[in-house]
A protein has these predicted regions:
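Membrane-anchoring alpha-helices and their flanking helix-loop junctions
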Residues: 1-83, 98-201
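Glycine-rich acyl-CoA binding loop
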Residues: 86-87, 91-95
Length: 201
């Protein structure tokens, strides 16, 4: 049994196997990395949306920037990040991933890429979010509840009070956390290399 499911009700048979697969972090990350290359290797010139490539690249860059931004605030299992991107959503790294994946689907241009991405997100992300929330609540019981009640999981609320820039907290961003603790620049370079390959065709 995965340590991610130790606190969950016990299951057996096929239900147990499927749940273990859905909670398996390495599988989720590996498949996500593979999908980047697959979507970029197989591309259609007849894109579903006109000028999709420009919009898609913008979406990918925004997703990468979101990941870089978020990774510079988080220190896994040692502190509860509630500032910067974590003032808007509880899981900004996943938000960035979704933007990147949608952008790659648009670049790919085939219907099957959207179906594949949807199945991937549906299969892995609800359990990943559930586990992260459960873990953080256990590690930081005094602060997690209030923060989670005010902060959505993936989609930020509309900021109507005009304080969005002060909430960004860019001065607290740390390259050391992003580079050393989370290896985020490696992911950025990997995705950008594949996008560059597509653009050279």
């Amino acid at each position: 049994m995965s340590n991610r499911t130790n606190d969950l009700p016990k299951l057996s048979g096929i239900k147990h196997l499927i749940r273990e697969m859905r909670y398996h972090e390495f599988s989720r990350q590996s498949i996500g990395i593979i999908l980047v290359s697959v979507f970029c290797l197989e591309t259609s010139s007849n894109s579903i949306i006109p000028y999709a490539s420009n919009f898609a690249i913008s979406l990918i860059l925004l997703g990468l920037a979101t990941r870089m931004y978020a990774s510079g605030f988080v220190l896994k299992n040692k502190e509860l990040s509630t500032t910067g991107p974590y003032a808007f959503v509880r899981h900004p790294l996943y938000t960035g991933n979704i933007m990147i994946l949608i952008g790659l689907c648009l670049i790919n241009g085939f219907f099957w890429s959207f179906v594949t991405a949807f199945i991937f997100l549906w299969f892995y992300y609800p359990t990943a979010i559930e586990y992260e929330d459960r873990k953080l609540k256990s590690l930081f019981p005094d602060t997690w509840e209030e923060w989670a009640s005010m902060t959505p999981a993936l989609m930020p609320k509309m900021d109507l009070n005009g304080k969005i820039f002060s909430r960004l907290d860019l001065r607290s961003w740390s390259l050391k956390k992003s580079l050393i603790a989370n290896y985020e620049p490696v992911i950025v370079v990997y995705v950008l290399v594949w996008v560059f390959i597509v653009l050279q065709r």
